[in-house]
């Protein structure tokens, strides 16, 4: 058998299907090969760089609303010596248009975190004066009130305020001001002073778009109910301080100036420390009455004041700095009390004033001194009233008098004058904005503290406001404070200057600086005003220039003259207590006091001089012998035995038995024991004034003709 190989027509033979399969496999392989690719090593890194670039482009293209911080610098040029003005930081800062009209309109909220105030001096070396400046963190003050911080005109200076000092901790709306700096110079208007350079750092957040033009009005939505107006709440709390000089506690003290006082200021939920003005309401050589000013914003306010008067002193030198070394007591006169008055256009109404005091125990001893002459430890008060302020104004608070004499000095004694810090009591003033229909300011009378007693106080719930209105042009430093002559429905006038009380009842006049008081009513009201200035008294003729004149006696003088005979059976304090218990009015208390005074005066017709003491028989016999025959002959023997004398047979020789009394001694014989004690104490502090008072003193009512004819022989 042989094998046949066909080489010609392959496609036509049995090998054709196999060839087709090979061709299809070759074509399929050619189609798959182009899909397979080798990736270059650098391509993934290029792709990541492109993604990073995209992220940066997205971050810069889409704002996220974050805040920013900017710094602004502006100047106030061409200042003269007596320049004055203010910087109000916020939308009212007209001295910096870039801040006011620029970036501030592009944000909803801002806060100034730092203020650098620099004064660049341009004055000549011969110029004098300074520029005082003050920070107002709440934009409540319209004029400079504190002169503590100053720039010298010839030197210049700088002051930095941080966020906590300028109310810059919290964010503020871009439409409200944050704080204010006020300044005022005391130089000449013709002298060039320099300029201010101010640098502020501002933080901003929540940007907004401001096109500068008003948008077209949109359809008005359905009106919503008007929210109730927020009632503001303001409080002042603090202890006024005063520097005094004292030496020994049996000597008088010297008072320094009051100046500015520092107290805590609370408004709604915010609080900080602020300064307010204080000065003396009146001052004399015997006492000084302090006065404090408090700001009142525009509106109607209900004011409640709590005063706890206590005057401890403390040392100002090491090693006992700040330690208590005694106190200054209060007088027991009814002319000393806490009271309020109007200032700067405010109107006070519905005044309610309750004053109390605490007496010292007679056996209480402080620095070897006792409380046996009516000195008081404390004087407290609770005062409430309504005040209406058409614009921002002030009212003032008057405290009890600070006594300067040794009678009220309970400090440690030193050999020389030393400075002491004295507290004037705790004062709390609360202002609650009063809106109609809210029922605010419903006052409930507080009961007196344990051991305290009510006293006469200015009290007129439905009457006119207080009449004390000190003005800048009125010299209030030289006159004495007026006592209130109107008895309230709580207490009487007992113990006042005109009531014949202990030492405070004496009326003294020593020229302009006088402690005398007088009755005064103004415009039909019962409120005391500041007395008008008086001319100095004419010089007195030395020697015995006293004259005896008849005058209408008063009930108080009669009671002091003979307390046993002119006692009506009940005191003025009893009238006050009965009026309080019966809830009587002012008229009821006044009528009862007038009736009591008439009862005292009616007793003058039955008054008789005190009967003479019984005379012993021996003295009566000598008097009868002297009338019948003169004493002649005999001697007074020094060595004679007791009871043996040669009167009647001897003579008196040599010397005088009794010297002639001086005019001053005869005047002193007319004083009562209480007046003599007061005179001796007053003579230690001011001998010339004590002598003048002695020669001007008028004797009590002349109910006995013998005393009227012979005033220098004293009482029998």
From Swiss-Prot:
| Pfam families named among the record's database cross-references | Luteo_coat, PLRV_ORF5
Going by the entry's taxonomy, the superkingdom of the source organism is recorded as Viruses
Which stretches does the entry tag as region Involved in the efficient long distance movement of the virus and the periplasmic subcellular location? 694-698
Compositional bias annotation for Polar residues: 475-502
What segments bear the compositional bias annotation Basic and acidic residues? 459-474
Q: Where is this site: Cleavage?
A: 443-444
Chain positions covered by the region annotation Disordered:
1-68, 207-228, 438-547, 630-655
- Give the Basic residues compositional bias ranges: 18-30, 44-61
For the region Readthrough domain (RTD), give the residue spans. 210-716
Answer whether the UniProt record assigns the keyword Glycoprotein to this protein: no
Keywords of the record: Capsid protein, Host cell junction, Host periplasm, RNA suppression of termination, Virion
Q: Which GO terms describe its molecular function?
A: structural molecule activity
**One Gene Ontology term, aspect cellular component:** host cell periplasmic space
**Family note:** Belongs to the luteoviruses readthrough protein family.
Report what the protein is called: Readthrough protein P3-RTD
Comp. bias (Low complexity):
1-17, 645-655
UniProt lists compositionally biased (Pro residues) regions at 216-226
């Amino acid at each position: 058998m042989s094998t046949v190989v066909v080489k010609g027509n392959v496609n036509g033979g049995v090998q054709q299907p196999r060839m087709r399969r090979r061709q299809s496999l070759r074509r399929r392989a050619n189609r798959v090969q182009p899909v397979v690719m080798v990736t270059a090593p650098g391509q993934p890194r290029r792709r990541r760089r492109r993604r990073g670039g995209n992220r940066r482009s997205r971050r810069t293209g889409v704002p996220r609303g974050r805040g920013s911080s900017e710094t602004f610098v502006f100047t106030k040029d061409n200042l003269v010596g007596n320049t004055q003005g203010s910087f109000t930081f916020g939308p009212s800062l007209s001295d910096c248009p870039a801040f006011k009209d620029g970036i501030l309109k592009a944000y909803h909220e801002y806060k100034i975190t730092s203020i650098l105030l620099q004064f660049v001096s341009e004055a000549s070396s011969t110029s004098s004066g300074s520029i005082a400046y003050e920070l107002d963190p709440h934009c409540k003050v319209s004029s400079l009130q504190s002169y503590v911080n100053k720039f010298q005109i010839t030197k210049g200076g700088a002051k930095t305020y941080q966020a906590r000092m300028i109310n810059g901790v919290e964010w503020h709306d871009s439409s409200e001001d944050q704080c204010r700096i006020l300044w005022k110079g005391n130089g000449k208007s013709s002298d060039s002073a320099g300029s201010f350079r101010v640098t502020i750092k501002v933080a901003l957040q929540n940007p907004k778009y401001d096109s500068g033009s008003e948008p077209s009005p949109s359809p008005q939505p359905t009106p919503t109910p008007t929210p109730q107006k927020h009632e503001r709440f303001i409080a002042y709390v603090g202890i006024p301080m005063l520097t005094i000089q004292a030496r020994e506690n049996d000597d008088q003290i010297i008072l320094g100036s009051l100046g500015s006082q520092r107290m805590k200021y609370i408004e709604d939920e915010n609080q900080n420390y602020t300064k307010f003005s204080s000065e003396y309401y009146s001052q004399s050589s015997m006492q000084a009455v302090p006065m404090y000013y408090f700001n009142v914003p525009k509106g109607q306010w209900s004011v409640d004041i709590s005063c706890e008067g206590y005057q401890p002193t403390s040392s100002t030198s090491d090693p006992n700095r700040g330690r208590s070394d005694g106190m200054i007591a209060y007088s027991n006169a009814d002319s000393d009390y806490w009271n309020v008055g109007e200032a700067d256009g405010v109107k006070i109404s519905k005044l309610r004033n309750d004053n109390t005091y605490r007496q010292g125990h007679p056996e209480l001893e402080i620095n070897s001194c006792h409380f046996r002459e009516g000195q008081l430890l404390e004087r407290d008060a609770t005062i409430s009233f309504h005040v209406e302020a058409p614009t921002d104004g002030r009212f003032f608070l008057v405290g009890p008098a600070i006594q300067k004499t040794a009678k009220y000095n309970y400090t440690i004694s030193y050999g020389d004058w030393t400075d002491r810090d004295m507290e004037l009591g705790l004062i709390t003033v609360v202002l609650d904005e009063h809106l109609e229909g809210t029922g605010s300011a419903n006052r409930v009378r507080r009961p007196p503290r344990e051991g305290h007693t009510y006293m006469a106080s200015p009290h007129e719930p439905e009457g006119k406001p207080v009449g004390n209105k000190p003005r800048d042009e009125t010299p209030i430093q030289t006159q004495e404070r007026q006592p209130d002559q109107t008895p309230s429905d709580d207490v009487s006038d007992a113990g006042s200057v005109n009531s014949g009380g202990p030492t405070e009842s004496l009326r003294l006049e020593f020229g302009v600086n006088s402690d005398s008081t007088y009755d005064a009513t103004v415009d039909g009201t019962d409120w005391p005003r500041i007395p008008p200035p008086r001319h100095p008294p004419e010089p007195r003729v030395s020697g015995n220039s006293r004259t005896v004149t008849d005058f209408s006696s008063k009930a108080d003088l009669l009671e002091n003259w003979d307390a046993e005979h002119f006692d009506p059976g009940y005191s003025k304090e009893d009238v006050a207590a009965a009026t309080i218990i019966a809830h009587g009015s002012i008229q009821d208390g006044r009528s009862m006091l007038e009736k009591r005074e008439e009862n005292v005066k009616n007793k003058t017709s039955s008054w008789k001089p005190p009967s003479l003491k019984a005379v012993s028989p021996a003295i009566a016999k000598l008097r009868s012998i002297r009338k019948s025959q003169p004493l002649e002959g005999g001697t007074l023997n020094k060595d004679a035995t007791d009871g043996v004398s040669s009167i009647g047979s001897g003579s008196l020789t040599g010397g005088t038995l009794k010297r002639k009394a001086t005019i001053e001694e005869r005047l002193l014989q007319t004083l009562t024991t209480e007046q003599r004690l007061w005179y001796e104490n007053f003579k230690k502090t001011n001998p010339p004034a004590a002598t003048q008072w002695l020669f001007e003193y008028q004797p009590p009512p002349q109910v006995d003709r013998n005393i009227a004819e012979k005033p220098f022989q004293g009482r029998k």
